[in-house]
């Protein structure tokens, strides 16, 4: 779902205002199961604005936030036994004050970022198109889905990156009734990822040196200052296994497994394969949902390993690869327990969702030895109250808080004093200073909906998040949207 365009439908109109269905949200990655996500259809079109601003960067590579506006449409339709869904959106905005990062989709391609010491704001445009279809008989269910996300990121002052991203997701799934209304399902998914990048300098006084980062403050020294045209090429395979009641009530079990691999290739060095990485990920979900309450246990884990290719002397402009070194590892696990209690009062609805989580993350670089360990506990509480007022109006009020409390943290940076450039060491220390300390987030939501007639409605929604970090650092996120519902 597009997070910038809030669905903003009154709980009297839409079941997703209940928090119960989100307890089993991982199950809906199987398109055969997604036809039971909502009991009724809906469509909306709207425009939104988002401002995400931090007074000083928590992570220098992510900068001080983002400002963007968005227009989009979503639909989820039911006809007899069939279900169709889809969405399309366009986003335009600016990523603010990014440093040591001239690459996009950092969470996808790290640690193999291309960087310089200048950085700055980056303009961005994003496009998304997605759709899916599912159907069922008495004993069988099936579904398919497809989505494509594209992005353009650039800067009009030196250094001048231009990044074009593309992400294609295709999945197909099926399910068989096993007992009562329970269906056992399986789905297969494929993802293709591509990012093409180039950096230009037009200042006649000289150019800034480009670095190819390799993790935890290190960089590939041999190719520093070269390779300003490059691309990332990745593929992901995934499988999902489910046990799900078509009524949406009862025990729900989901296991999602995936493997993603990608290469970083320097185009202007005869497509030299500089780096390779793989990411194995697992997500397990067990939930029990009743009419007015539910409980869920979630476990997620991943292992990411990165490799640096070693090359001999170039012959006729071609570098022969002579070795591959496994130099970077990032391993993480997270457990969470959450529950929902909800109750209706006439046309009003109240729900409360407490949760507690624990996460472990360990990043390692082999030589020089670098290591960051962060273990943290994250309790949270969220509540919503929805009620009618005046004629044909409805209001939703939501509030929540998350508290991130590190219980163990370690950092080791061998040879930091001799590392060049020193800005990369500062980058790692800066990120650790925030990740190893507490932070507290408060969330608020207000939405107003009005029925125009039996077919149409309008919705206005505003969200505000405030996160307080150490060093008098704070983040403010404001999201607003105006939607037409039909």
Language model features: what each stretch is:
Residues 41-47, 82-88, 142-146, 182-188, ...:
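Transmembrane beta-strands of outer-membrane beta-barrel proteins
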Residues 78-81, 135-139, 176-180, 243-249, ...:
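Outer-membrane beta-barrel strand-turn architecture
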Residues 218-354:
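Long, internal scaffold/assembly segments composed of regular secondary structure
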Residues 9-96:
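N-terminal, post-signal peptide beta-strand-biased segments of exported outer-membrane/organellar beta-barrel
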Residues 55-62, 97-103, 154-162, 197-203, ...:
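Outer-membrane beta-barrel translocator domains and adjoining extracellular loop/strand segments
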Residues 180, 474-486:
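Outer-membrane beta-barrel "beta-signal"
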């Amino acid at each position: 779902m597009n997070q910038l365009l809030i669905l903003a439908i009154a709980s009297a109109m839409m079941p997703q205002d209940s928090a119960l269905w989100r307890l089993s949200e991982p199950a809906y990655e199987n398109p055969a199961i997604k036809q039971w996500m909502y009991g009724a259809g809906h469509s909306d079109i709207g425009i939104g604005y988002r401002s995400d601003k931090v007074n000083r960067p928590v992570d220098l590579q992510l900068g001080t936030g983002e400002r963007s506006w968005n227009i989009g449409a979503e639909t989820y339709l039911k006809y007899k036994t069939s279900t169709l869904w889809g969405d399309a959106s366009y986003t335009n905005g600016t990523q603010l004050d990014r440093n040591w990062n001239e690459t996009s989709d950092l969470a996808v391609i790290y640690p193999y970022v291309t960087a310089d010491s200048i950085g700055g704001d980056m303009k961005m445009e994003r496009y998304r198109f997605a759709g899916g279809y599912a159907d069922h008989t008495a004993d069988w269910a099936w579904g398919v889905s497809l989505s494509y996300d594209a992005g353009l990121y650039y800067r009009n002052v030196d250094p001048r990156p231009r990044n074009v991203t593309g992400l294609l997701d295709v999945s197909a799934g099926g399910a068989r009734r096993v007992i009562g209304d329970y269906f056992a399902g399986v789905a297969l998914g494929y993802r293709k990822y591509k990012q093409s990048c180039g950096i230009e300098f037009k200042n006649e006084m000289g150019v800034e040196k480009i670095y190819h980062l390799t993790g935890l403050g290190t960089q590939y020294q041999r190719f520093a200052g070269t390779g300003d045209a490059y691309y990332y090429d990745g593929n992901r395979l995934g499988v999902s296994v489910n046990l799900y009641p078509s009524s949406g009530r009862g025990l729900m079990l989901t296991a999602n497994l995936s493997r993603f691999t990608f290469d970083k290739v320097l185009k202007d060095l005869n497509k030299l394969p500089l780096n390779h990485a793989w990411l194995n990920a697992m997500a397990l979900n067990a939930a029990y949902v009743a009419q007015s309450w539910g409980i869920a246990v979630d476990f997620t884990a991943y292992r990411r390993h990165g490799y640096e290719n070693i090359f001999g002397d170039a012959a006729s402009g071609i570098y022969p690869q002579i070795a591959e070194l496994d130099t970077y590892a990032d391993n993480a696990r997270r457990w969470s327990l959450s529950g929902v209690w909800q109750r209706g009062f006439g046309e009003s609805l109240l729900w409360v969702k407490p949760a507690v989580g624990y996460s472990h993350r360990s990043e390692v670089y082999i030589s020089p030895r670098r290591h960051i360990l962060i273990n943290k506990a994250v309790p949270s509480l969220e509540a919503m109250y929805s009620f009618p007022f005046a004629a044909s109006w409805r209001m939703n009020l939501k509030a929540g808080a998350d508290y991130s409390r590190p219980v163990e943290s370690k950092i080791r940076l061998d040879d930091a004093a001799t590392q060049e450039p020193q800005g990369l060491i500062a980058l790692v220390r800066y990120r650790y200073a925030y990740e190893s300390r507490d932070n507290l987030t408060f969330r608020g939501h207000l939405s107003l909906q009005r029925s125009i007639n039996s077919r149409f409605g309008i919705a206005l929604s505003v969200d505000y998040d405030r996160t307080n970090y150490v060093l008098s650092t704070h983040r403010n996120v404001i999201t607003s949207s105006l939607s037409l519902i039909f």
